[in-house]
């Protein structure tokens, strides 16, 4: 039996548009982002996907993308699980900074390492910073030592994997069709795990906003196939645009 999993990065957010590092800052979608969410729903509807359950983060750009896609699918009733473990990678002291200006200051190579390397985190956010998640009431029930002040992709994967094993994988093994709407780096982490991508290869992986990535999985959840829905060239160009965000103007 083939299991189906869709990974969907949220639509364009205001800070995607502004080319700023977002991380755990709770920025909403732009109008373009809302259109992308609806378009993702149409692509999934055209594919004939009937989901049993959905998962998302606790950040509204992902939540609103999921809501927009489910409305287009006419599956608004779907059970939805929200978890901080699906949040975007925490960008530490870079959060809120303009990516191009940061590249001009520190060099494109350094910014690429911070954005796309596997195990090198950006400079950490100070615990006293009001933007640190220990001061956010949505995380009040969590061990403050589990809340990051910065993350690499490796530590993001360490955060995401327990949720995969405890919540998502059992549903897939039960034969459920699952939709995960999350963020560029939490989805890169899942992609790396599912496809056993090397540390070197993951540096070049960019996930576009608002384009569903369909995985077909075997019974043991190894990957049988995966592809973006819709026009492959559109997905390629969108991923290329993501890669260019970290370049100086």
From Swiss-Prot:
One Pfam family this sequence matches: His_Phos_1
Reaction catalyzed: (2R)-2-phosphoglycerate = (2R)-3-phosphoglycerate
EC code(s) of this entry: 5.4.2.11
Top-level taxon of origin: Bacteria
Coiled-coil regions, chain positions: none
InterPro entries: His_Pase_superF_clade-1 (IPR013078), His_PPase_superfam (IPR029033), PG/BPGM_mutase_AS (IPR001345), Phosphogly_mut1 (IPR005952)
SUPFAM superfamilies registered for this protein in UniProt: Phosphoglycerate mutase-like (SSF53254)
Sites where the protein binds substrate: 9-16, 22-23, 61, 88-91, 99, 115-116, 184-185
Pathways per UniProt: Carbohydrate degradation; glycolysis; pyruvate from D-glyceraldehyde 3-phosphate: step 3/5
Site keyed Transition state stabilizer: positions: 183
Keyword Isomerase listed: yes
Signal peptide: none
Alphabetic keyword roster: Gluconeogenesis, Glycolysis, Isomerase
Single GO BP term: gluconeogenesis
Similarity comment: family membership: Belongs to the phosphoglycerate mutase family. BPG-dependent PGAM subfamily.
Subunit field text: Homodimer.
HAMAP family in alphabetical order: PGAM_GpmA
Protein's recorded name: 2,3-bisphosphoglycerate-dependent phosphoglycerate mutase
Organism of provenance: Stenotrophomonas maltophilia (strain R551-3)
Underlying gene: gpmA
